């Protein structure tokens, strides 16, 4: 956790929020089969394996993402939690920001904030993702396809956040797709 905070992927004013989320996660722990909503879910792989938190340089150039591309969409590619601008075709009406840039402009208010273990982990360990803003009175002509690809030979844990601001009298269709070619575990959160 301390390594994540030291990376400075987020404004330092958010460190207190992240530390509180991590402390609360440590108190709650991972769900067990005794939890009603988790009684049929095997999470033992989380404790049986070692995971490394993804870094910005974990974006492989050797991924054939064309098999995941959806025709007639604007595709935003995120590899191992990090936005790959050079592989993306964002429409000109879309203002794409890093989460750092976005959170410098906005207050970090999680919509429908939940204190579940995976939400708390995402809040505390998030160091990647993408944010985009659609200005007022804007219509995006084709769906926005957010393609999350997990790849690599290492066991990575990825906790990206996607922040979407669609302003008044604007419209867009957003499709999120997840593809994994590795043992990577993703704990994504989308805020609209």
Regions found by a protein language model. Name each.
Residues 1-192:
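Glycine-rich and polybasic anion-binding loops at the starts of cofactor/ligand-binding domains
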């Amino acid at each position: 956790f301390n390594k994540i905070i030291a990376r400075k992927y987020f404004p330092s004013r958010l460190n207190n929020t992240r530390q509180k989320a991590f402390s609360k996660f440590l108190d709650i722990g991972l769900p067990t089969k005794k939890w009603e909503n988790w009684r049929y879910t095997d999470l033992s792989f989380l404790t049986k394996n070692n995971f490394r938190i993804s870094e910005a340089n974990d974006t492989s150039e050797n991924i054939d993402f064309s098999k995941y591309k959806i025709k007639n969409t604007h595709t935003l590619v995120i590899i191992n939690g990090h936005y790959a601008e050079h592989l993306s075709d964002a429409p000109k009406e879309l203002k794409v920001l890093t989460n750092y840039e976005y959170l410098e402009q906005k207050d970090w208010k999680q919509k429908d904030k939940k204190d579940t273990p995976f939400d708390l982990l995402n809040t505390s360990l998030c160091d990647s993702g993408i944010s985009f803003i659609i200005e007022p009175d804007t219509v995006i002509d084709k769906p926005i396809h957010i393609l999350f690809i997990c790849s690599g030979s290492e066991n990575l844990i990825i906790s990206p956040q996607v922040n979407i601001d669609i302003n008044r009298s604007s419209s867009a269709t957003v499709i999120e797709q997840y593809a994994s070619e590795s043992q990577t575990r993703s704990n994504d959160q989308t805020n609209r």
